[in-house]
Amino acid sequence: MTSLAELRKNYSLGSLDVGDVDRNPFRQFDTWFKQAVDAQLPEPNTMTLATVDPRGRPSARIVLIKGVDERGFVFFTNYESRKGRELAANPYASLLFYWIELERQVRVEGRIVKTSAEESDGYFASRPLGSRIGAWASNQSQVIESRSQLETREREFSLLYGDQPPRPPHWGGYRLVPEAIEFWQGRPSRLHDRLLYTRSDEHSDWQISRLSP
């Protein structure tokens, strides 16, 4: 069996200093995200979403970011899924973007709010037809008997709605409103650069602190 203790990589592609970054973390994120896209990284819009259930037990999964602006980070999902139920019980979450080819991470923490129905409708209408039908066919996170059961539901909803399926009432968007955003740049000898943006409320200026790696 491979010895996991021997797997290691020394990071040396870049550095990160307070004088190098934008004072606004959303603009800084946009800069890094564009660099990830320009570097042609595979699916740079993927992120890990961590939630916590009422008993304090965490869960995590990969989801896709679908919007970022001064209000926060937006993603869409089934409100009745495990993550949806956990966010209803505890409306706080953490996101992690990991761009290993650039030796970078971005960690975002904050409270969760639902997007407006208009935002959810607009994004849902932009999805491929198969994905829109799939939102009806899948009772996300629920146990099913077989793959064929899922495919039967897909056919049934396809016949029912044709090429104009409406947005399911149990499907829509969330916005994570950040309270903290950390930018991480890998450095040699595990002495990485970590810059943390925080603010006391949504109307305050962002403060930047350097964290020990």
From Swiss-Prot:
GO BP annotations, alphabetical order: pyridoxine biosynthetic process
Catalytic reaction equation(s): pyridoxamine 5'-phosphate + O2 + H2O = pyridoxal 5'-phosphate + H2O2 + NH4(+); pyridoxine 5'-phosphate + O2 = pyridoxal 5'-phosphate + H2O2
Record-annotated residues binding FMN? 61-66, 76-77, 82-83, 105, 140-141, 184, 194
Q: Which residues form a coiled coil?
A: none
* Biological pathway: Cofactor metabolism; pyridoxal 5'-phosphate salvage; pyridoxal 5'-phosphate from pyridoxamine 5'-phosphate: step 1/1; Cofactor metabolism; pyridoxal 5'-phosphate salvage; pyridoxal 5'-phosphate from pyridoxine 5'-phosphate: step 1/1
Keyword Protein transport on entry: no
Pfam families, alphabetized = PNP_phzG_C, PNPOx_N
How is the cofactor bound, in the record's words?
Binds 1 FMN per subunit.
The UniProt GO MF terms for this protein read: FMN binding; pyridoxamine phosphate oxidase activity
Q: Which UniProt keywords apply?
A: Flavoprotein, FMN, Oxidoreductase, Pyridoxine biosynthesis
Q: What is its EC number?
A: 1.4.3.5
Question: Which of the seven top EC classes does this enzyme belong to?
Answer: oxidoreductase
- InterPro entries annotated for this entry? Pyridox_Oxase, Pyridox_Oxase_CS, Pyridox_Oxase_N, Pyridoxamine_oxidase_dimer_C, Split_barrel_FMN-bd
PROSITE patterns for this protein:
PYRIDOX_OXIDASE
Which HAMAP family does the entry mention? PdxH
Give the record's family classification: Belongs to the pyridoxamine 5'-phosphate oxidase family.
Quaternary assembly = Homodimer.
- Give the function comment from the record: Catalyzes the oxidation of either pyridoxine 5'-phosphate (PNP) or pyridoxamine 5'-phosphate (PMP) into pyridoxal 5'-phosphate (PLP).
What name goes with this protein? Answer: Pyridoxine/pyridoxamine 5'-phosphate oxidase
Q: Which organism is it from?
A: Paraburkholderia xenovorans (strain LB400)
